């Protein structure tokens, strides 16, 4: 059995002292390899982690972005709040997918060879997506139970039944909180536009609000609250504070599976938005050392770097680590470890810039 290199341009395919049966005769690839060897090596503060999928690890040591990209064109200066939110959820992936147009792989779903006792996260989402809108429309609990059992998400047996009853009770309480908040009539639609200047260029952050009420904004998601929920609520909240119409409180209420949170009035929303747009403009040119879960863990645990690293790197208690995302791995390839002494201050600065103003306005119930 002959093991051929995965890539047609692998060095092993052009090694004259190697196995002749795997040798390549592609002149273009050979010339490219010669040029890469002739180029002076670039120094890095810390070696990149070698990807186990690479033939010899050489690819992992080559920076994916050796230099910042050119400044984004004028079309990027128009910033819908949804786009800014998508950027902050994963700046590295956003840079590769939106600015460079790459299509990154998502983790493949593992095929099950047995029937689970309880739904996992994948099976949980469709069940909630079917039941919650019906409960918000006033569907009785017994009818919701029938609707749940009509789908494939609830496993058979006692474990599945107990899971369903627990979820129905939780969803019913959650829907009641949402309905209580939405009892107030909706106000006329409101368009919010905030121009901010970054390096002499004006960027426009904007959003349309069709769900404003006198008590402010409502954001809800039936899941455990976390940095994603705070960020998704924070950006519209800043626009509301900067452009609140008469008769509307500059307050945002967030309802989650495990409780509620509130965002109170921000004293300087334009300045905060300007800082976020500065990060956005920078993140459109080079990988930004902002990772929401890791950054929040650092801020929320008395600036413990160990807590941030635990969120970023996979381990027994963190199989879905933030640093394992394909976009993060590719964007950071060949660059210093973001938590190394040489560059960790950039991680600190980004975390503070995003989360310090948010935490100053955040109240938990």
Where are these regions (language model features)?
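Anion-coordinating catalytic cores for phosphoryl-, nucleotidyl-, and glycosidic chemistry
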Residues: 1-365
């Amino acid at each position: 059995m002959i093991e051929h290199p995965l890539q047609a341009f692998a060095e092993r395919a052009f090694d004259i002292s190697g196995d002749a049966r795997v040798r390549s005769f592609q002149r273009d690839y050979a010339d490219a390899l010669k040029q890469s060897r002739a180029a002076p090596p670039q120094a890095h503060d810390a070696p990149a982690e070698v990807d186990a999928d690479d033939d010899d690890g050489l690819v992992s040591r080559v920076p994916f972005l050796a230099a910042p990209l050119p400044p984004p064109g004028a079309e990027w200066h128009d910033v819908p709040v949804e786009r800014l939110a998508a950027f902050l959820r994963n700046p590295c992936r956003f840079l590769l997918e939106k600015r460079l147009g790459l299509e990154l792989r998502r983790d493949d779903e593992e095929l099950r060879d047995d029937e689970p006792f309880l739904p996992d996260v994948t099976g949980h989402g469709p069940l909630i997506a079917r039941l919650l809108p019906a409960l918000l429309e006033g569907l009785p609990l017994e009818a919701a139970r029938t609707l749940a059992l009509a789908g494939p998400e609830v496993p058979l047996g006692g474990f599945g039944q107990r899971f369903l009853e627990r979820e129905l009770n939780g969803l019913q309480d959650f829907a009641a909180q949402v309905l209580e908040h939405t009892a107030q009539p909706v106000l006329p639609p409101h368009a919010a536009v905030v121009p901010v200047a970054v390096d002499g260029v004006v960027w426009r952050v904007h959003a349309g609000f069709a769900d404003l009420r006198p008590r402010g904004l409502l954001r809800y998601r039936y899941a455990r609250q976390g940095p994603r929920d705070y960020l998704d609520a924070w950006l519209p909240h800043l626009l509301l504070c900067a452009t609140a119409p008469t008769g509307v409180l500059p307050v945002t209420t967030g309802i989650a599976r495990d409780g509620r949170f509130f965002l109170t009035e921000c004293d300087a929303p334009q300045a905060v938005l300007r800082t976020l747009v500065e990060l956005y403009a920078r993140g459109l040119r080079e990988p930004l050392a902002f990772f929401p879960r890791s950054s929040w863990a650092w801020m929320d645990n008395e600036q413990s770097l160990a807590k941030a690293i635990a969120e970023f790197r996979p381990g027994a208690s963190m199989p879905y680590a933030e640093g394992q995302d394909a976009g993060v791995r590719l964007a950071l390839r060949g660059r210093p470890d973001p938590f190394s002494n040489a560059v960790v201050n950039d991680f600190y600065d980004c975390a503070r810039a995003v989360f310090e103003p948010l935490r100053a306005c955040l109240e938990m119930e």
